[in-house]
Design a protein with these regions (language model features):
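Short flanking/linker segments adjacent to small metal-binding domains or redox-active Cys/His motifs
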Residues: 160-163, 239, 300-311
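N-terminal pre-ligand scaffold of iron-sulfur
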Residues: 220-257
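FNR/FR-type flavoprotein reductase catalytic core
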Residues: 76-230, 237
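Residue-level marker of beta-strand positions
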Residues: 37, 86-89, 250, 266, ...
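Ferredoxin-reductase
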Residues: 1-87, 91, 137-140
Length: 311
């Protein structure tokens, strides 16, 4: 864990708050690359993940937090209570959404999904890689980093709904063209549908969710399964109204939780035996169907009566 100080706060558009963090020691914070995020332990008792944004060569960290009407505590605290000079505990950066080398890049962002893609745009500009960024917001006043994006190259802010215009902005597939998509689950589902209709290779589409996908109901309502620890043989029932993580914590098992929505990957745990009912948004379909699978303890369940995990 790293100790950081809030070095600055400012508005980015009318719904987002930028937060600059510096190391309490005055040293440079650990290096990162576009697509990385950190866990922020807020004084209100919640842990939230925020994408790092801005220039990745800076010694400080920049995050941008959207104001959520249905906040579970994180965005409300940041917008209403956080102040310059406050001390926060943060994790080292993790990157589940890296920017790979490509001949050309398409960036598609909706809402606060702009945060990792703004960092990618700066990196692509610095390396001379051709790119186009389409950024969808409800109105111009909602846009974060609007001034910076206007100076960053081919960055276009749209106030039209992506449901009706995304197909116009999605080019035909090319061998060296890759797309990075970030925003609400519905936006990314639409982007993937458009890409599939145009013949894109799924391996050329890279995405990160800022909201969990809608829950998928499977099996019998109220079905109970058993989770078993491979290391000790201990097993406990997981009722329909509790997650695997909650059951493990109730029985004294340390679980690395962060988002608790299946969008960060912090609680992914290898599966030894059993059939996972995947409900996370962080793993690809290929990862969810691979021989060596992982289960998101915060949200996923089991199709089999028992799930044996590597804990």
């Amino acid at each position: 864990m790293l100790n950081a100080i809030v070095d600055g706060l400012w508005r980015e558009g009318d719904k987002s708050l930028a937060v600059r963090l510096v190391a309490e020691t005055g040293d440079a914070l650990p290096a990162w690359q576009p697509g990385a995020h950190i866990d922020v332990h807020l004084p209100c008792g919640v842990v939230r993940q925020y994408s790092l944004t801005g220039a990745c060569g800076d010694e400080s960290y920049l995050i941008c937090v959207g104001r959520e009407a249905a906040s579970r505590g994180g965005s409300r605290y940041v917008h209403e209570t956080l102040r310059p000079g406050q001390r926060l505990s943060i994790s080292a950066p993790r990157n589940l959404f890296p920017l790979h080398q490509a001949e050309r890049v398409l960036l598609l962002a909706a809402g606060i999904g702009i945060t990792p893609l703004y960092a990618m745009a700066l990196q692509l500009k610095a390396t001379g890689t051709p790119f186009t960024l389409h950024y969808y917001v409800r109105n111009r006043e909602n846009a974060a980093f609007a001034r910076e994006l206007s100076q960053c190259g081919d960055c276009i802010i749209h106030t039209t709904t992506p449901r009706t215009t995304l197909a116009e902005h999605f080019p035909a597939p090319e061998a060296g063209l890759h797309a990075w998509v970030c925003g609400p689950a519905g936006f990314m589902e639409k982007a993937r549908d458009v890409a599939a209709a145009k013949g894109w290779n799924d391996a050329h589409i890279h995405s990160e969710a800022f909201q969990p996908a809608p829950p998928v109901t499977s099996g019998v309502a109220g079905e109970i399964f058993t989770v078993k620890l491979a290391s000790t043989g201990e097993r406990w029932p997981v009722p329909a109204d509790k997650t695997i993580a909650q059951v493990l914590q109730e029985n004294g098992v340390d679980v690395p939780l962060s988002c608790e929505m299946g969008i960060c990957g912090a609680c992914l745990t290898p599966v030894i035996d059993g059939v996972v009912d995947h409900r996370d948004s962080v793993q690809s379909e290929a990862e969810k169907s691979a021989a060596d699978q992982q289960v998101a303890l915060c949200c996923s369940r089991s199709h089999s009566g028992e799930l044996v995990i590597a804990l």
